[in-house]
Amino acid sequence: MSFKKDDKVTFVIEDIGTGGEGIGKVDGYTLFVKDAIIGDKIEAKIIKAKKNYGYARLEKIIEASSDRVTPACPVARQCGGCQIQQMSYQAQLRFKEKLVDDNLKRIGKIEGYEFFPAIGMEEPFRYRNKAQYPVGTAKDGSIVMGFYAGRTHSIISCTDCKIGAVENQYILAVIKSWMEFNGVAPYDEQTGKGLVRHVLIRTGFHTDEIMVCLVINGTKMSDKLKESLVGRLTEVSLDSDISTDKCIKSIMLNFNTENTNVILGRQCETLWGKSYIEDYIGDIKYQISPLSFFQVNPRQTEKLYGKALEYAGLTGNETVWDLYCGIGTISLFLAKNARKVYGVEIVPQAIEDAKNNAAINGIDNAEFFVGKAEEVVPHFYEEMARLAADTSATEAQREEARKSITPDVVVVDPPRKGCDESLLDTIVKMSPERIVYVSCDSATLARDLGLLAAKGYKTVKVQPVDQFSHTVHVESVALILKEQPAID
């Protein structure tokens, strides 16, 4: 039977896609349906029909799945942030476990590993320490703040995101009132005019410090507007609506005049307070600027990094490489338990932050390099290999060079695209006993584990960690051991 656009069909959802879409079949024809979950019997309208599969819009739930819940957020269906808020949290964890395990087996052809249930959150709401709200103009001419609808740049009004900090809504209300009172226009993507593009709010969950950063379409703002903004925001930090334990410690401007989807520009100005806030992961203190990369769920990050530290098996004598180290979040965790840690990150500002974070924590056994890991590590390996063989160098220099290129442990925490194969080749050449792979995409994790398996490294344990409830994203930590050659 063939199907075409606008056909209405009734069927049961049997699976969930990687984007959170419900998947079902009608007479063998596969349909993907946003907002539907496993077990739902639905009526849907086909919006795009291809030869072997199509996409449909959920029209009516005839019989709800036992895992279906009412989303806490009233705009969950329109907003592009939470794809699976309509699933119970336990069902979300099961979905993520299955996603990781299936990818390892299907893509990586990985077998014989110990797979653990996902580490979930005690409270799967209010977990994000960072929110970036686009600012625009509604059809009636009023100022709108919120989030983009899925796959669009249409702003859905939402100032109380249920996975963000509760304080954000009150801060946004003050900024909106300030804009209205002073005639400050929102940025218009079509014309390139208007001043305020985004509002960035960062919260220190362990320190209760808040940063507010206005991203503006310009390189300056009048002193009168600055003083007015600071006056209003410093008052809101004492507002009864906000927990008295939390207050604004930093008010910043960020300048972005580019016609781009990138939210932040390169330059910032401190209007009031500090140019950063502080927070902790475990007992490591971090300074966080508007431009800093910092994990958005610090409570789950402690569990994630704790598992990485456990898998690293450090005793205090090891040499460790941390590739894609960011601002040193994992590096500094490891450094307290290792002889020496080397970190590599492509973003220069992140390396400056890493060095600063090492200094404020009194950590002197971590060294950081700027550049692409797939370029820095092979180059460093060749350079240190020459030094290790250089008879004109001191024995201490040669020994340190040997240790640096024969690490006991390598930790990788790559972006979603995973590791470059040339980097994996160099890691294998370094011959560490252990590789700890922290992944934000189980498909590329599976691919890379398959490549490592072909080079003599066996995946032993895999632990999913839910960092982002109500979304389809899941982190994983894998322990990979060097296989010992068989003894005849």
Predicted feature residues:
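Short, acidic/hydrophobic/Gly-rich beta-strand patch recurrent on exposed beta strands
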Residues: 22-27, 146-149, 213-215, 354
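Short beta-strand micro-motifs enriched in acidic
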Residues: 45-49, 134-138, 202-206, 481
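Extended interfacial segments that mediate partner engagement and assembly in macromolecular machines
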Residues: 59-66, 70-71, 77-186, 206
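Short, solvent-exposed loop/turn elements at beta->coil junctions and helix N-caps
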Residues: 116-124, 189-190, 197-198, 202, ...
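Internal alpha/beta scaffold segment
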Residues: 155-197, 218-252
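Short, aliphatic-rich beta-strand segments
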Residues: 201, 208-217, 285-289, 409
